[in-house]
């Protein structure tokens, strides 16, 4: 083994010293040499006996060589990258397959998988637009029964694959969003993404199994606190470049407005904790005979419904209360219904823009004279606006002589980027005012990972050389508020981040205007789920919302979550109404940041407490 390591070290040092004069991700055939020299060792008995150690050593030396090469010259050899990570990935997949085969041979493991799949399969159908939301309070009971009765290996097996099924059902539409490259790469990427999401279920299962038997003075404290841990686990999906906080469990109750009013107190993560607590209580009732716990879902439902009904019975909670006040702006939302395949095809550009302009001219009520704002969707101009003088002139002329502003989505760029992309690309919104010569630009701050940008491309500039058809946008930093109606622009994916809504309100905003192109989702449930998430933001913060989409669902949402003029998918519509500005203060607006970062801290504290308790318990054993 020492000879093998020596050979690999010498070869990798030689590769680093060879210093190929190439930029970015480069091809250098000599990087195959360490891999080819490693192959003969496979036929040695000692190598096969210590295959894992040899493989990890080989990959470790190769990774160190890659890191040094990147640190010195800011480039990476594609061949070396492949010869280091592909063997490790194949080895991991082999062991994962063997582990799954072993679990599948166990009858109880298959039964556990069936029960867990029933749970998560049902839960996937609890989200809007389906009306099964209240079932979320009991759908996960079979999964928790499995976790209460299974060993670690069975729990992990059942949780990963049932999570995979759940995520396939819940995220099947991602294929349409990712459809920007070779089909094989898209499918591989989709499988990896679904697997990544499923890891969260697996982590929850592993922690639960470890925590279930830990007691402090006979009380299963960690088990009692598990709902808060799960909420903290969901919070981890809201931070970092990989963040994708789309399907938090609490979103399942979105179709029942009375059930949502407690969002103003506990927010989305509080709802997740309540749902986990309800399911765990019923599972405990079945497994441990604590029959009184079986009433938990009924009690929780009654409390949520009772509180929500009380809140909605107040006069100020009437739909769009104070809509006729002078300060309530009159807003027109244009849904042009441009098919996605035409939208980004240059051959259709003129027809796409002409159709949009015709709708704006013919269907918007310009004659009333009291229209304050016209809103068009994300990338309604499917090009860089600074190259389109004709379109800018048309927009300025359209609002000239009126009191109406116009907000529209388009692309933009500047030349302040870094190599290899000296140009920064922006997904933007542009506000045209009748009394101003120039427009005001807003840049989208949260970009969809892998679709609009590669995660950590600012930390590792080498990723800017990777091109598999994804967007290469740069995020903005500002959260502006536009006068005179104190509204803040949001673009698409940003609205699922509660912290951004609170940030805009702290900046003085009293109305959210969201533009999006949900045409990427196709005819799927994603558009309804997206609107549902906006509804949660409205109730959490008492924040009215105007939503404008390309293909639907456009709508107006008031500060209690009432919806009005909700459009159908793939219809051409213009909807217009007055929308009252924010006049409701909520507890969660004030404590939301503390709650969410508190849950994040609790997540890590829970893991630390579990580790310390298990270590103490193990050391106390004879």
Q: Which functions belong to the PLM regions below?
A:
Residues 127-142, 166-173, 335-336, 369-384, ...:
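Short, conserved active-site loops that position catalytic residues or coordinate cofactors/metal ions
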Residues 330-334, 488-490:
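Short, well-ordered beta-strand segments
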Residues 267, 333-345, 379-380:
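Membrane-interface junction motifs in transport/secretion proteins
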Residues 2-316, 523, 534-537, 548-551, ...:
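Membrane-embedded alpha-helical bundles of multi-pass enzymes
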Residues 300-332, 339-342:
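Hydrophobic alpha-helical transmembrane segments in integral membrane proteins
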